[in-house]
C-alpha cells in the first residue's frame, strides 16, 4: 500500500467572533442547541464556541414553575467586555515593550538624581525633544506604570506630582495692619507683566526655640527663587537678608504674609511692600509652590542647624534649573537671565 503524508504549509488565520455571531450563539443556546451544532451552523470550530460560552456564561437565579432554580445564561455583551478588558490589560505591556532601554535607564537615573532636576513631566518633554525618533510614553502613561508597579521607580520616589489647584477668589479681611494691603497692589504686579516683583516667605525646620529658618524669595514673572538661611526667624534678620538681595537682584516690590518676621519690611527705603490677607496663602501661590518643591530636599520637622548656605543654594539651583511646564518647558533660571539682560 502506498502511504503518504501530506503536510500543509498554508497559514491558518483566526478571526474573532463578531457581535452578531455572539448574538446568534445566545439565541441558539436559548433553544437548546449543543455547542457542536452551533459551531456547524456558524462555520466555526467547536472549541471556539465552547470557549466563548464558558467566557460569557453567568448563573442567574430564576423562578421555574414557581420554584427558584439556577440557570446558566450567556450574555453576548459579557463576552465582549471580557475581550476588551483582556486587550486593555495586554496593551499596557505592549506599550512598555515598545519603550527603549535607554529611555528607561535615563528616566530612572533622572528620578533618583540628588538633587533632582526633573519631574516626570519635564523629563518626558525634554527626552522627546532630544530624541525625536524614540518611542516616548506620555506623562500619564508613566504615572500609570509607576502606580501599577511595572517600573523600577516607585511612588515613594516621587515626592510631588503635578497638581491642578483651584483658584480662590474669597478675600477675608486683614486683621494685622503691617503696611499696604495686597488690594492696593498695581495691576502690573497682579498680571505679572512687570519684572522685579517678588513674593517672600519663611520655611521652618524643627519647632524648637532658636531654630534657624530659611527665607525664600520668588520673582513672580519668571518663578526664579533666592534663598537665605537665617540665624532665627526674626524681623531684623529678614530685613538684613532682603537688603543683601536688593544689591544683587532687581527687587521693585515684595508681597508677604502677616508673619511677625515681616513686620519691619515696610521700613526699607525704595521698596514697595504689600501684605496678603490672613489665612490666604493662595495669594502668594508662586512662593508657596516653591516652598513645596524645596521640601523635597528639606522635609518638615528636619532641623536646619546643620544646613549650610552652600548646600541650600545647591537645592535652590536645582529647582531654578528645572524645565517648567508653565514656561513652555524652559527653566526659571533661563527666563530670569534673559529678562534681566533685556
From Swiss-Prot:
Keywords: DNA recombination, DNA-binding, Transposable element, Transposition. InterPro entries: Integrase_cat-core, IS30-like_HTH, RNaseH-like_sf, RNaseH_sf, Transposase-Integrase, Transposase_IS30-like, Transposase_IS30_CS. GO terms for molecular function: DNA binding; transposase activity. One of its GO terms (cellular component) is cytosol. Gene3D superfamilies: Homeodomain-like, Ribonuclease H-like superfamily/Ribonuclease H. Coiled coil: none annotated. Pfam families: HTH_38. It comes from the Bacteria. GO terms for biological process: DNA integration; DNA transposition. Residues 182-342 form the Integrase catalytic domain. Belongs to the transposase IS30 family. Required for the transposition of the insertion element. This is Probable transposase for insertion-like sequence element IS1161. It comes from Streptococcus salivarius.
